């Protein structure tokens, strides 16, 4: 894989109703970076994140993930590389049990059934929730759901983790636990958030989005000093 594993050049996206989502976004991320994407509601953060896993394709410009330009033809390869954690865990948890949810991705990627249990339990243990494996997701707390949703992405062994508001709705203890877990991950991390304290703790770099464009890009402590 290329050392510069995420590169956006003049990225634009216009929704079907003509509303611009992002405008002229350019940046380059190198392997192992942790980058916060910050900005007000409606700035374009979520639109940008949805490009990184190929849920949206750019109207104009290019996006490269490792060795793959983001195109319809390369979606499978891009999605093996990038794991997406949505803001609402209920958007990711839909199977009868936690184990089934975390196993869903590896099975779809074609991992041999005999290996699936191992990767599922490793992912659950990484998030500190192996005891939840037989529970139905709808009976979990918000923090437990978030941990399981992240485990469901870790089980697919992505190189890059993309997260939308990972600390949203968590109580202080669950938030602090998640921050410590994120700091321990060696993945490249791209995290959209309004939680600026979390950004300072987890991300050495921050990209500021305003009205769909990049208005600042630099060290988190310099940009978010307050």
What are these regions (language model features)?
Residues 136-140, 144:
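Conserved ABC ATPase signature
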Residues 161-164:
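Catalytic Walker B motif of ABC-type/P-loop ATPase nucleotide-binding domains
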Residues 38-40:
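The feature captures the beta-strand-to-loop junction immediately N-terminal to the Walker
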Residues 213-226:
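Conserved beta-strand-loop-alpha-helix hinge in the C-terminal portion
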Residues 114-132:
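Conserved ABC ATPase "signature" region
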Residues 193-194:
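H-loop/switch region of ABC-family ATPase nucleotide-binding domains
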């Amino acid at each position: 894989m290329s050392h510069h594993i995420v590169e956006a050049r003049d990225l634009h996206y216009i929704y079907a109703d003509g509303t611009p989502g992002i405008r002229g976004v350019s940046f380059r991320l190198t392997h192992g970076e942790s980058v916060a994407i910050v900005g007000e509601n409606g700035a374009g953060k979520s639109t940008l994140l949805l490009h990184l896993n190929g849920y949206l394709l750019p109207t104009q410009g290019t996006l490269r993930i490792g060795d793959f330009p983001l195109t319809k033809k390369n979606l499978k390869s891009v999605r093996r590389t990038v794991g997406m954690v949505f803001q609402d865990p209920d958007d990711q948890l839909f199977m009868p049990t936690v184990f089934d949810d975390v196993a869903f991705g590896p099975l779809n990627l074609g991992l041999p059934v005999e290996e699936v249990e191992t990767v599922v339990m490793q992912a659950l243990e990484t998030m500190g929730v192996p005891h939840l494996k037989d529970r139905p997701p709808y009976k979990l707390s918000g923090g437990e759901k978030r941990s399981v949703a992240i485990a469901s992405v870790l089980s697919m062994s992505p190189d890059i983790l993309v997260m939308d508001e990972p600390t949203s709705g968590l109580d202080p203890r669950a938030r602090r636990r998640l921050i410590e877990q994120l700091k321990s991950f060696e993945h490249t991390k791209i995290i959209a958030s309004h939680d600026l304290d979390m950004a300072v703790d987890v991300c050495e770099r921050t990209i500021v989005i305003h009205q769909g464009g990049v208005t600042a890009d630099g060290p988190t402590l310099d940009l978010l000093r307050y």
